Swiss-Prot record:
It comes from Bordetella avium (strain 197N). NDH-1 is composed of 14 different subunits. Subunits NuoB, C, D, E, F, and G constitute the peripheral sector of the complex. One of its GO terms (cellular component) is plasma membrane. Belongs to the complex I 49 kDa subunit family. The keyword Cell membrane applies. NCBIfam families: NuoD (TIGR01962), PRK06075.1 (NF004739). Its EC number is 7.1.1.-. It is found in: Cell inner membrane. It holds the Pfam family Complex1_49kDa. It catalyses: a quinone + NADH + 5 H(+)(in) = a quinol + NAD(+) + 4 H(+)(out). This is NADH-quinone oxidoreductase subunit D.
Length: 418
């Protein structure tokens, strides 16, 4: 009798559902997965090593390019680690701005996750709906930093600039936008950035309802997600899960509540948790987080309206002087020149700072030898821990379910390969 061998199949890295450059070697018995072996490193750019040859400020833009869907949250952990070592604290207004943009980033990330997960499984419409709202939030990024993605907006000691009083307007009509649509878009952008964000928070709950109408009770969506990739709470903790992956298994661990940073202890929000630990519960957790992030943004907008103030510390050894002062005062010019050529020196020591990133706990472990460059920078990427469980989560499932599991893990290779 002939020996029966399992079939080996390469999934990715060119596969559209591979979320970038995942190469997955699947061992199959018929169509049932026996083993899944992820091969990583195809997007390795040596970020940790590059940072050792740049000043603390020059290394900041590298952070945006790690998880390139949650840009400002990456920056946040990095600047928090530097501030911890310098012993400085950002002004209260800057802390509120950071929290607000962290939550805007969380919505950006979850919309991308939701849309691409649905697209992978075969529901195309949700992706188009999600990108409609992402466009508005990209405009918020652009308003404060000039860039739609890689903002470099958070700085040690605060943020780059205060929130602008005006928003850019859209130009003439095109075949993609009618006069009526253009007027509606420009009306929302006729005031300040805070007005625009407030208008968005008023509209957004109805948008989330639309996504839920398309997916939550959809029979095909539930058949594809319910009971797939189940991880129990103890195993989730043992595997190092954080974020929606851990909360989907029923563990209410959220750094914003358990180890509050910035002004999260002043915010009123809930931590959604799942029950069954399957792909469907993780989807429900992310949808609930969209609503909670919207709540937090509203609270930040209300506070920021009523409390003007500085957004950067006044120590010009760390933070650059204002542009007008720099061009009229010799001492300020020297500060500016020294800061952007030599940078600032961080006292010898080490610090770990972690934020509740949209994908989980994103941590920066920073070691300084007293120089103007990091001696060592270690990045704790949440997706790295989640990807290692892919083999365990997909065993016994069909090939098509591997796509569902990759989608639910919300993997981005910028942070995994670093």
């Amino acid at each position: 009798m002939a020996e029966i061998k399992n079939y080996t199949l390469n999934f990715g890295p060119q596969h559209p559902a591979a979320h970038g450059v995942l190469r997955l070697v699947l061992e199959l018995d018929g169509e049932v997965i026996q083993r899944a072996d992820p091969h990583i490193g195809l997007l390795h750019r040596g970020t940790e090593k590059l940072a050792e040859h740049k000043t603390f400020i020059q290394a900041l833009p590298y952070m945006d390019r790690l998880d390139y869907v949650s840009m400002m949250c990456n920056e946040h952990a990095y600047v928090m680690a530097i501030e911890k070592m310098l012993g400085v604290e950002a002004p209260l207004r800057a802390q509120y701005i950071r929290v607000m943009f962290d939550e805007i980033t969380r919505i950006l990330n979850h919309l991308m996750s939701l849309g691409s997960h649905a697209l992978d499984v075969g529901a195309m419409a949700v992706f188009l709906y999600a990108f409609r709202e992402r466009e508005d939030l990209m405009d918020c990024y652009e308003a404060v930093s000039g860039a739609r993605m890689h903002a470099a907006y958070y700085r040690p000691g605060g943020v780059y600039r205060d929130l602008p009083d005006t928003m850019a307007q859209y130009g003439e009509t095109s075949k993609y936008r009618s006069d009526k649509e253009l007027r509606a878009m420009n009306d929302a952008r006729s005031g300040s950035l805070l007005d625009f964000i407030e208008d968005f928070t008023n509209r957004f709950p109805a948008c989330v309802d639309e996504y839920e109408t398309l997916l939550t009770d959809n029979r095909i969506w539930k058949q594809r997600l319910v009971g797939i990739g189940v991880v129990d709470p103890d195993r989730a903790k043992a595997l190092g899960f954080t974020g929606p992956m851990l909360r989907g298994s029923g563990v209410a661990w959220d750094l914003r509540k358990t180890q509050p940073y910035e002004v999260y202890d002043l915010m009123d929000f809930d931590v959604p948790v799942g029950v069954n630990g399957d792909c469907y519960d993780r989807y429900l957790v992310r949808v609930a987080e969209l609503r909670e992030s919207n709540r937090i943004i509203r609270q930040c907008v209300e506070w920021l309206r009523n409390n003007p103030g500085p957004v950067m510390i006044e120590n010009h050894k760390i933070a650059p002087p204002k542009r007008e002062a720099m061009k009229s005062n010799m001492e300020e010019l020297i500060h500016h020149f020294k800061l952007f050529t030599e940078g600032f020196h961080v006292p010898p020591g080490e610090a770990y700072a972690a934020v509740e990133h949209p994908k989980g706990e994103f941590g920066i472990y920073l070691v300084s030898d007293g120089a103007n460059k990091p001696y060592r920078l270690k990045i704790r990427a949440p997706g790295f821990a989640h990807l290692q469980s892919l083999d365990e989560m997909s065993r016994g499932h069909m090939i098509a379910d591997a796509v569902t599991i990759i989608g639910t893990q919300d993997i981005v290779f910028g942070e995994i390969d670093r």
